[in-house]
Amino acid sequence: MSFRKFTATADPEKDETIARKGHFYGVYLLCSQSLDSRYRGKCYVGFTVNPKRRIKQHNRGCDFGGAKKTSRKGPWQMVMIVHGFPNNIVALQFEWAWQQPTLSTRLKIFPELKRKNPRESHFDYNFRILNRMLGVGPWNRLALKIRWLETDYERGFEVPLPRHMEIVSGKVSISSSQRRKGEDAAATVPVAWAPECHLCMQRIDQPERSRLGCTNPTCRLTCHMLCLANYLLGDEPGHYIPVGGECPLCETRLSWSALLQRKRLLNGIPEELLDQEEADEDLSDGPDVDSDVEVLESD
């Protein structure tokens, strides 16, 4: 049996700022540390935009923003979180499927996920569901990070994950600034764009909307977004959005999500968007949404 090795990128004892407020979407797994044997070891799957705040809400109870299903059944530990979703809708769909594998169309092909095995812990059962989810579409084409928050629970994945997914360790912290550390510097580096697409050799009209380049700052790749997408898809018929591939000029390994992020930084964030983010606290800094689904499994 082969397991994928862990890739630790953070000191587990320290917080790591990985996203700015309003741009983090995570689906987490809680495990109860209750002294009551009825609840100890039970698990809960939820969605959050701020993991540190969310675990505090769960442990304080539903009167303080926690979920009704976790009240008085803790204390809880947030042991792992999956993040890197492009938006909250995709993350909430992932959350629902993880909660309800027997109802998910994507997971019905795995009859072994219908119930927990007799001697299997609740954590191991939920981890087994997650392992299968990450290997099937549409989730297997997302640039996701599987982040361990508690080292005592870390283990390998029995079913190998897609190569573009990362397994990392370390706590999560959300930055309140409009940009992550280093983003301002990246956005101010001058780019020597070519007037034509390197792939179709046609002029690029409306470059702010349709132009993409390499993430390697020394590479002069200039392409239409559609041309580069088709190039990276290569021999993947039936797909419209690539996962990644090699730069056609410098052969740097590219991630499609990183290309789009770089494009956003180079174009800048419109002032009206910044104003909306600062004004709409209910969207970016309000209570998290939890699906009203019970996942505290019984033996």
Curated annotation (Swiss-Prot):
Its EC number is 3.1.-.-. GO terms for biological process: double-strand break repair via homologous recombination. Its main location: nucleus. Residues 23-109 form the GIY-YIG domain. Keywords: DNA damage, DNA recombination, DNA repair, Endonuclease, Hydrolase, Metal-binding, Nuclease, Nucleus, Zinc, Zinc-finger. It comes from Drosophila ananassae. Coiled coil: none annotated. It is found in: Nucleus. A zinc finger (SLX1-type) spans 197-250. Its cofactor is a divalent metal cation. One of its GO terms (molecular function) is zinc ion binding. GO terms for cellular component: Slx1-Slx4 complex. It comes from the Eukaryota. Belongs to the SLX1 family. This is Structure-specific endonuclease subunit SLX1 homolog. PROSITE patterns: GIY_YIG (PS50164). The gene is slx1. Catalytic subunit of a heterodimeric structure-specific endonuclease that resolves DNA secondary structures generated during DNA repair and recombination. Has endonuclease activity towards branched DNA substrates, introducing single-strand cuts in duplex DNA close to junctions with ss-DNA. InterPro entries: GIY-YIG_endonuc (IPR000305), GIY-YIG_endonuc_sf (IPR035901), Slx1 (IPR027520), SLX1_C (IPR048749), SLX1_endonuclease (IPR050381), Znf_RING/FYVE/PHD (IPR013083). Forms a heterodimer with mus312/SLX4. Pfam families: GIY-YIG (PF01541), SLX1_C (PF21202). Gene3D superfamilies: GIY-YIG endonuclease, Zinc/RING finger domain, C3HC4 (zinc finger). Residues 273-299 are annotated as: Disordered. The keyword Cell division does not apply. SUPFAM superfamilies: GIY-YIG endonuclease.
